[in-house]
Amino acid sequence: MSIKEEAAKMKLASPLMASASAEKRNSALLHMIENLEAGKEKIFAANRIDLAAAKASGLPPAVMKRLAFDEGKLADSISGIRQLISLPDPVGKVTLARQLDEGLRLYRVTCPIGVIAMIFEARPDAMIQISSLAVKSGNCAILKGGKETKETNRVLFSILHEASTSANLPSEALFQAEQHSEIDELLTCRESVDLIIPRGSNTFVQHIMSRTNIPVMGHADGICHIYVDKDYDMAKAIPIVIDAKTQYTAACNAAETLLVHRDIAKDFLPVLEKAAGEKNIHLRGTKEAGEIIPLNIIENDDFRHEYLDLVLAVKIVSGVEEAIDHINRYGSHHTDAIITENINTAARFMQLVDSAGVYQNASTRFADGFRYGFGAEVGISTGKLHARGPVGLEGLLSYKYKLFGKGHIVEDYACHKKDFHFKEL
């Protein structure tokens, strides 16, 4: 059966999935946890095969790190599912209740989007995140992972699909597309697929966006900044910068650029250089920064580069206004932070930086659905429509309007036989 036919079947099954009870959906999530724990050795064995093949093909360390699925990532994935179970049912939530006239009541109610296609590179934990979020939110999900983790993805999908069906959810709730050739066909399934969420490199995401008329939610780059203001606290600044760069260098929310106020550069940069050296961080930057500490000189256009490695670009700026201008010009609208004790400067930075996440005195690595208490995330959206930032349950929901009347007709209001009497319920 072709991917187009599978998507059509899922579209027909999506109302059944949307109407499944919260108890049934949570039961499926519990089965996912049980199956993942019971099948972990099988998962790890499959992942070792993928890692060996990736190493033989010469994939870079940053990609290898994303490919790996170990005890730590399994534990994080299971924690995310447990958190999802603990969250209230997001489906059927009334967000507006209004009486339009006597006996005429309007309600706005949350509902699943329908059929979501998740196309991702490298990260096998994305398979677990999107499957669990889809089940909790009552959506059907088509999952297409990268060839680099085909063995891991195959085992994970088998485990997750069995958990879903064992809770009596529709068998069409989850589907795995395994062939690369299926992607182009999937991108044409406008009548069956409601949303595409790509996760991967800039080139990959741009490729998806340019080849489909289906709505796409996601981000193409993770060029995150930290600006150290003149009113900074050294005891906070250094640990934040080091954490944002090294806690997980291959993550899209890792810091790539450090902006430093000119007034404190001579005091701050030598301390940074020492801390960076201890963590094997390679510093690059402008000529002005290079006059204070040793680093490789780069040009302005190089600040558009996402390193995903132990590399940090450094630039000295005149103040918060230049920092804001640089971030909005060279950034990717993902997550950017300011280190300052001045609440007015922080407020201006957070108001004018055009990013999905703006932080004061905190690491950019906090930009994550699990750390936001969403349970898990399908990705981070840098767009402004529908969802922005880490996309959890709410980003996978739409809404519908339910109107209850007693024989009401518009003509009565058009000819002023009746008048609207709006009242919140």
Model-derived features: positions:
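N-terminal Rossmann-like NAD(P)+-binding subdomain of aldehyde/semialdehyde dehydrogenases
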Residues: 1-105, 133
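Residue-level signal for inorganic ion chemistry
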Residues: 21, 25, 138, 196, ...
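C-terminal core of ALDH-fold dehydrogenases
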Residues: 27, 325-425
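Aldehyde/semialdehyde dehydrogenase
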Residues: 41, 180-199, 203-207, 248-358, ...
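A structured beta-alpha segment of the ubiquitous adenosine-cofactor-binding alpha/beta core
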Residues: 70, 101, 105-106, 174-193
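Conserved small-residue-rich beta-alpha loop and adjacent elements
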Residues: 86, 90-162, 214-216
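Solvent-exposed alpha-helices and their adjacent loops that cap or buttress functional pockets
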Residues: 97-98, 107-112, 135, 166-170, ...
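ALDH superfamily catalytic-core signature
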Residues: 121-125, 129-140, 155, 159, ...
